[in-house]
């Protein structure tokens, strides 16, 4: 770390140095530390570049390398490095599908996957951690055996969701599933919930803390 700090002091302004230091602080990936040390001059050159200043100065998670000149593969190693380097997800997806609960998302995803040959993972089947979701999508998007893909977003209570959203292409096409409120209530009332895993007790009495149910029903930030 002392070697990195010495180089940063020589090559970057305090504000630019904080970009890399923040990324190092937020990571527990030893491979990322080693990568940053081995490529510190390339990272500094990019942070000093005109392209970075014009495009990423105000970005909440600016990339530490030029995302347009990165050679990657579908490995977990590359996916984790890309997350720590704040690299946007590869732009190989056709669109983003936003699906609030109760709008027929499962049926639409089946239509995409089976009828349209567009591979799209159901977000509610993925871990509730944005890094894991990013890595899974990153590996899929770099898999040459999968041609057409889309990304599904359905939940808000995901760890590090803000970073995940910031690493999506802001110019992507978006399909948003909607439904009238009464229709959503009818759907949820008539649905078979027997196969749904719930994170709260299904038996309670007057001493039970009702806030557990309210917190489950409400979207919340982690």
Language model regions located:
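PAPS-dependent sulfotransferase catalytic core
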Residues: 1-145
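Serine/threonine-rich low-complexity intrinsically disordered regions
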Residues: 1-2, 13, 29, 39, ...
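Short, flexible helix-coil linker/hinge segments at the edges of structured domains or between repeats
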Residues: 123-127, 133-150, 193-214
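PAPS-dependent sulfotransferase catalytic domain
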Residues: 157-222
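Conserved nucleotide-sensing/catalytic segment adjacent to the nucleotide-binding pocket
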Residues: 131-175
């Amino acid at each position: 770390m002392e070697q990195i700090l010495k180089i940063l002091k020589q090559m970057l302004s305090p504000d630019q140095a904080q970009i890399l230091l923040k990324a190092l602080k937020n990571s527990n990936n030893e491979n990322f530390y080693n990568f940053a040390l081995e490529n510190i001059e390339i990272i500094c050159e990019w942070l000093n570049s005109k392209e970075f200043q014009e495009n990423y100065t105000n970005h909440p998670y600016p990339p530490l390398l030029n995302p347009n000149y990165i050679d990657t593969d579908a490995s977990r190693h590359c996916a984790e490095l890309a997350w720590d380097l704040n690299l946007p997800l590869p732009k190989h997806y056709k669109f983003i599908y936003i699906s609030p609960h109760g709008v027929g998302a499962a049926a639409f995803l089946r239509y995409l996957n089976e009828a349209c040959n567009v591979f799209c993972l159901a977000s509610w089947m993925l871990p509730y951690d944005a890094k894991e979701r990013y890595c899974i999508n990153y590996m899929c998007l770099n898999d040459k055996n999968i041609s057409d893909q889309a990304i599904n977003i359905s939940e808000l209570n995901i760890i590090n969701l803000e970073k995940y959203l910031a690493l999506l292409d802001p110019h992507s096409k978006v399909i948003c599933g909607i439904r009238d409120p009464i229709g959503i209530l009818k759907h949820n009332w008539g649905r078979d919930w027997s196969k749904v895993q719930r994170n709260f007790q299904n038996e309670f009495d007057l001493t039970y803390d009702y806030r557990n149910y309210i917190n489950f029903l409400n979207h919340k930030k982690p």
